[in-house]
């Protein structure tokens, strides 16, 4: 009931997370009520909560700053910058990129692309996240560099894949620390994803 909703909010869950929990519980109650012909009302139906509570607005990175960052990536030319460049022109989530195998990068197709699929060390956020992503611009450059790197590892980014786990938190901390010097305040690696959405709409 509402006490459980208030408990979740008190724990610090943002509105969208509260919504997912409540939806799951609502479905269980609906099933039980239907299956056992119970004469009671589902207490989780019609429950109000602020879905945007605790969610900070994520800003897109302006295109001029994207180009500046991409130029810096090609100048520094190391695996951290390859990951930044890869994300910048694909709209991938950082964890998706960090957990790639080199065999997920298909450069010899008519349209070079990443075949993004779940792996035991890095699942995807949703079933719809499995997709082919075209490689262009900075992301194609990064993919080409990755295909030639780390001959002793199947991973595109070995430093973030150890003990059968992709350490996307470590990647996020390192890359956001570097990125914040070159993008507006409030922008993060995830902002490339929002920028890609805006670029595709333009």
Language-model-derived ranges and their functions:
Residues 1-6, 45-48, 197:
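Short, conserved phosphate-binding/catalytic loop or strand-edge motifs used
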Residues 1-30, 55, 76, 164-170, ...:
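N-terminal core-binding DNA-recognition domain of tyrosine site-specific recombinases/integrases
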Residues 9, 87-88, 201-202:
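Short amphipathic helical patch at the helix-1/turn junction of helix-turn-helix
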Residues 15-24, 34, 38-100, 128-129, ...:
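Basic, Lys/Arg- and aromatic-enriched nucleic-acid-binding interface segment
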Residues 33-42, 106-109, 146-150:
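Proline-centered turn/helix-capping motifs that create local helix->coil transitions or kinks
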Residues 46-49, 99-144:
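Conserved tyrosine-mediated DNA breakage-rejoining catalytic core shared by Y-recombinases
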Residues 96-98, 187-188, 197, 202:
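Active-site-proximal segment of tyrosine recombinases
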Residues 119-120, 136-185:
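Active-site/catalytic core of tyrosine-dependent DNA strand-transfer enzymes
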């Amino acid at each position: 009931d509402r006490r459980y909703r208030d408990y979740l909010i008190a724990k610090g869950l943002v509105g969208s997370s509260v919504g997912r929990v409540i939806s799951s519980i609502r479905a269980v109650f609906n099933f039980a009520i239907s299956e056992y012909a119970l004469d009671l009302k589902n207490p989780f139906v019609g429950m109000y909560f602020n879905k945007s509570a605790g969610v900070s607005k994520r800003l897109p990175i302006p295109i001029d700053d994207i180009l500046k960052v991409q130029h810096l990536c090609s100048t520094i030319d190391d695996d951290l910058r390859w990951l930044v460049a890869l994300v910048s022109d694909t709209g991938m989530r950082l964890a998706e990129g960090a957990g790639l195998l080199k065999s997920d990068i298909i450069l010899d197709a008519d349209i070079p692309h990443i075949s993004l699929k779940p792996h035991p060390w890095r699942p995807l956020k949703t079933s719809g996240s499995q997709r082919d992503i075209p490689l262009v611009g900075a992301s194609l450059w990064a993919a080409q560099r990755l295909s030639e790197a780390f001959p002793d590892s199947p991973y595109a980014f070995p430093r973030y894949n150890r003990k059968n786990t992709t350490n996307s938190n470590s990647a996020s901390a390192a890359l956001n620390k570097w990125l914040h010097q070159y993008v507006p305040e409030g922008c993060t690696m995830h902002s490339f994803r929002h920028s890609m959405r805006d670029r595709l709409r333009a």
